[in-house]
Amino acid sequence: SCLVGSEMCIRDSLNTAYDSSGISNLGNEAVTLSDTTLAVSVLNTLDGNTSGTVNANTVTTLTGSASDLITAYASGGISNLGNEAVSVSSGNASTSQANTLAAATSGVVTATLSDGDLSTLAGLTETGNAYSITITDTSVDAAALNTLDGKTTVAINASNITTLTGAAADLNTAYAANGSSITGLGNEAATLSDTTLAVSVLNTLDGNTSGAIDASNITTLIGAAADLNTAYASGGITGLANEAVTLSDTTLAVSVLNTLDGNTSGTIDAGTVTTLTGS
């Protein structure tokens, strides 16, 4: 049943009229809709009932399956679509389908994506849409995760990730988004690609994950001696011990310097130090 005069009643009445065996000589009429929110399956049925153009100018929201929505946008018999919000309310959408829908309307596309691997999801072409995404990869490049984070307004479920790889700064960016636009991070192992790194960035990363950080690619660490010793003392960072070190201190306790000297077999550049204190 429907409320007489309501949009649902008008819409249903159009298709009912076409289906009626008691009404003849319909089939080539132009149709002007009054709906604002419309199930796309109903629109496609109406499009099939008449060879005339269906004017969907009043529609502000289309709902339904991704395939049905794409069918409506591809139809030459439906006019004035292109700025409505789209909700994939039946089933999921593939990355390819999401791109097709996003290109078809300037409105926000809301959908749960069926793809979970970063290599496929990297193919998303637009931003500002409400895609629900669950990453299925266990090892993920942090820069790729951050790029994906910028393509959806819905928090990305990253709970399947067990290893993050890449530059420490990119990993810290991902962790900074955790709890807001990314969820499920906090205990991943990390494999760094940096060769030269500010130790403050490394220590921040160490605080962001309870997983082990593989820093074996690092050949030079830069920063304050105390911060460097903190990194070397951490049980959460592996692969350090032979890095060159460039200090940023100007005044330094010699005991701290000697501890640092014992932490790495690499050369310590103390060129910034103007004052040494201690016995």
Give a label for each model feature.
Residues 12-61, 67, 71-85, 169, ...:
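Thr-biased low-complexity repeat/linker tracts and other Thr-enriched repetitive architectures
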Residues 63, 115-118, 165, 221-222:
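A short, surface-exposed interaction/processing loop segment used at functional sites
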Residues 38-39, 53, 93-94, 107-108, ...:
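Extracellular beta-strand scaffolds
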Residues 42, 96-97, 123-128, 138, ...:
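Intrinsically disordered, low-complexity regulatory segments
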Residues 2-10:
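Short, small-residue-biased leader/transition segments that mark boundaries at the very start
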